Amino acid sequence: MNPKFKNNIGIMVPEILMPAKNVDLTKWACVACDQYTSQPDYWNKCEEIVGDAPSTLRLMLPEIYLEKPGETEKIAAIRKAMHDYIDNGILQNLGEGFVFTRRSVGGNTRNGLVVALDLECYDYSKGSTTLIRATEGTIVERIPPRLKVREGACLELPH
């Protein structure tokens, strides 16, 4: 993150990395790691669909696997995939900027903006009044294993 964009509103300009044009986006896209946490069949099907193709599935640890056998190996594989995707041009650096998003669900359109959040302005505690706060309850027990995934990671992924 470029310090010249630091401010007092908790938002910073991110460096944008996007998949290369030859990446199959139907295999690239994946739901957030905290979804389907009690449905191993969902994640097994994702693995089957993705196969060996580049995918965000390789860049995050679905929470269903937290604190389970093989977690350490999965985290090492995530870090390796991050480096491989950068080194081999699977991820293309578009520079600093924002990404405007638009999605339609059930006939309603939602617009969004991908930004970088200053985590110094974040608090997940219930009743927090910080600039950036959780929109849903945080399961505190999941924070340490999530941090293990982020330690030494060369990428931060939007959620």
Over which residues does each language-model region extend?
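A cross-family signal for N-terminal binding/gating loops and helix N-caps
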Residues: M1-H159
